[in-house]
Structure formats: C-alpha cells, structure tokens
Amino acid sequence: MDAPFAKTPSNLLIAGVDEAGRGPLAGPVITAAVILNPEIIIEGLADSKKLSLKKREELYEKIITNCKAFAIARADVEEIDRLNIFRATLLAMQRAINQLSIQPDKVLIDGHCCPDLPYETQAIVQGDQNVPAISAASILAKVTRDREMLKYDAQYPDYGFAIHKGYGTKAHLAAIHRFGITPVHRKSFEPVRQLKLFIPEE
C-alpha cells in the first residue's frame, strides 16, 4: 500500500482533487484540492473512507500544515437540487481548484470525469487509493464534511446526522418518515422528494 505514495515528481505542481458527500440524502458535497510538497512525505495517506476518524483528523492537520497549497469548496443543497449531484460536484471541484493559492501544472481527479479547467487534467479511477495528492484531498473533504454534519446534528437532533452523516441508513429513513425533511435534505433525491413535509428553517 505504501508503494504508490513513495515518490511524487518534483518538477511539476500536481493538484489532487476529490469529493465527499455525493451519495447522502442531506448536506452539501464538499471538494478539496491539494498540492503536496514533494520534499515532505506524509506517511499514512490513503482513501479517507478506509481510515479511522482519529487517523483522518491527524492526517488533516499534517496535510494543511505541510502541503504547498490547499483549498476546500462546496456545492450546497440548493445547487445540488438545481443542477443535479453530478454537475454540482464538478462545480465544487472547479471552485476548489480555482481557490488554490498556487496554479498547478496538472490536476488529477478521483473518478471518471473532469470539470472544465484551464489546466491539463486527468481522471483516475481509485485515485484516492493510489495517488498521494488525491488521497490528501479525500481526507480534507471528508473531515470537513463530517464536521459540518455534526453542526447539522446539533441543529436537527432527531435525525442522527452525527452518526450516518446524511446517508440513507434505516435510522435516517425512519427519522425522515417520522419527522419529515429539513432544509438540509436534498429534495431531488429519493426518497426525500416523495415527502411533502418540511420542517421550517429556524
């Protein structure tokens, strides 16, 4: 697992990009772009979904402290409902890359598709497992989104956002059917769009 992370080309500024939150029924999609410092190897980078909460938090601090540049962006629920999740994710990726304090020579994106960018771009399937900069981006995006879902949990305590982070678990679906939907639910997603009950925004 360590081999793919051993070396990074030192003559190019490579930005890795990933997202967190495409699948949930609630909350934003968060994206991150990271340009790592090739002179500082961050041990333990991996797909954020395969790391413990404690490890993600530790790596988050190491990444933002030691990288050359990073940016975190988002597409809100309203944008997801208006554009669809695919287009909203690409928009959030564009925002993250455009917010970098350093212009990259190349952008590597986890997945199958790339947003429209003025840089050389490449989509890499399972890039979060094999490309250090993408792994770093996945960690920043995941930690940022999880922290936001904790805030939603405090605002809407009946839904268990702190536990499932907005994904369609049995407990989350049961809460939706019992209490209706909140302003942070994605109204274009099933089964949310089947429901007409809205909790007024406070």
From Swiss-Prot:
Phylogenetic lineage: Bacteria, Pseudomonadati, Pseudomonadota, Gammaproteobacteria, Legionellales
Function of the protein: Endonuclease that specifically degrades the RNA of RNA-DNA hybrids.
Domain RNase H type-2: 12-201
Name listed for the protein in its UniProt record: Ribonuclease HII
Organism: Coxiella burnetii (strain RSA 493 / Nine Mile phase I)
Gene3D superfamilies, A to Z: Ribonuclease H-like superfamily/Ribonuclease H (3.30.420.10)
HAMAP family: RNase_HII_B
Keyword Hydrolase among record annotations: yes
Family listed: Belongs to the RNase HII family.
Superkingdom per UniProt: Bacteria
Keywords from the UniProt entry: Cytoplasm, Endonuclease, Hydrolase, Manganese, Metal-binding, Nuclease
EC number: 3.1.26.4
Keyword Metal-binding: yes
